[in-house]
């Protein structure tokens, strides 16, 4: 029964409909890359950077980001949401693509782009993360609970020489519980896609994502060898995380189950033109 309950979010389909359903619960904050200084977050006077809105947004609030390019490093929401009242980050409809990029200053600059670590019920939806090499990850959910990353695109990310143990994946879930990574696109990635890692990881969902053209990067322990996994699941005593309905094409390794990784649920994942489907 626990496994069935875990799969319910897949059947409900975390989609644009679900994201729209969260709007209107609280206050709206607006962000535009073209805005001047001194904005107050209203539609008429938007903030210039996403962090300004993220600091203020509380449970039930939505941060609307106007289409454009945003250079972001270590963005940290100031508040958690609550069950049914997420803090939501999404593009402002009708304004074009929101592209988020790490500043990529130095190879040793291992900071996350969006840092949801320790937060609960934050929803990140509809952004494009593109063309950066040195970030620790695009989204960090270390110790997070109930957070969602949906309908985002992750394109041309990573660098083969970055070998830090915690800078291998696009999305990092360490000791996280009940989070969802759904309906996203990962293309041309160096390294790992989604990592579910840690003894306290439980009840996380990775579903309905597509993974295309992955290649390897170094590991701190691996010498000159290069490694890549689209979904990496390891080091957990509880397990009961679900990996379902994902699609993989032109990747070396689709799903890697390591050190208690077999305690989890895999359902109806598909692969085409890949070397290894599931490694345990």
Where in this protein do the model-derived segments appear?
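Bacterial N-terminal signal peptides that target proteins for export
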Residues: 1-11
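Bacterial N-terminal signal peptides
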Residues: 9-20
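Boundary at the C-terminal end of the N-terminal hydrophobic targeting segment
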Residues: 21-26
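Acidic Gly/Asp/Thr-rich repetitive segments characteristic of extracellular carbohydrate-active
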Residues: 31-71, 76
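Residues on the solvent-exposed faces and adjacent turns
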Residues: 33, 67, 79, 91-93, ...
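Right-handed parallel beta-helix/beta-spiral solenoid domain characteristic of secreted/periplasmic
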Residues: 45-46, 64-67, 80-135, 156-162
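Extracellular beta-strand/beta-solenoid scaffold signature
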Residues: 76-77, 84, 103-115, 133-141, ...
């Amino acid at each position: 029964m626990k496994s069935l309950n875990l799969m319910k979010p897949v059947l409900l389909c975390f989609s644009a409909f679900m994201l729209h359903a969260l709007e209107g619960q609280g206050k709206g904050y607006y962000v535009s890359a073209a805005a001047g200084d001194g904005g107050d977050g209203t539609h008429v006077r938007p903030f210039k950077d996403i962090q300004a809105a993220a600091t203020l947004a509380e449970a039930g609030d939505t941060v609307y980001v106007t289409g454009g390019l945003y250079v972001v490093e270590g963005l940290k929401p100031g508040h958690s949401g609550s069950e049914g009242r997420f803090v939501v980050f999404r593009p402002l409809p009708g304004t074009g693509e929101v592209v988020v990029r790490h500043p990529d200053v130095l190879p040793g600059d291992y900071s996350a782009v969006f840092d949801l670590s320790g937060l609960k019920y934050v929803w990140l939806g509809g952004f494009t993360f593109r063309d950066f090499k040195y970030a620790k990850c695009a989204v960090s959910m270390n110790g997070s609970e109930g957070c969602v990353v949906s309908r985002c695109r992750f394109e041309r990310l990573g660098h083969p020489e970055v070998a830090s143990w915690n800078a291998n994946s696009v999305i990092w879930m360490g000791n996280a519980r009940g989070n969802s990574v759904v309906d996203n696109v990962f293309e041309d990635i160096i390294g790992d896609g989604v990592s579910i890692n840690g003894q306290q990881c439980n009840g996380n969902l990775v579903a309905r994502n597509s993974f295309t053209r992955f290649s390897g990067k170094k590991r701190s322990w691996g010498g000159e060898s290069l490694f890549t996994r689209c979904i990496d699941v390891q080091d957990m005593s509880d397990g009961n995380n679900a990996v379902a309905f994902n699609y993989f094409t032109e990747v070396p390794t689709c799903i890697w189950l390591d050190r208690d990784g077999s305690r989890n649920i895999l359902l109806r994942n598909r692969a085409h033109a890949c070397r290894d489907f599931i490694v345990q």
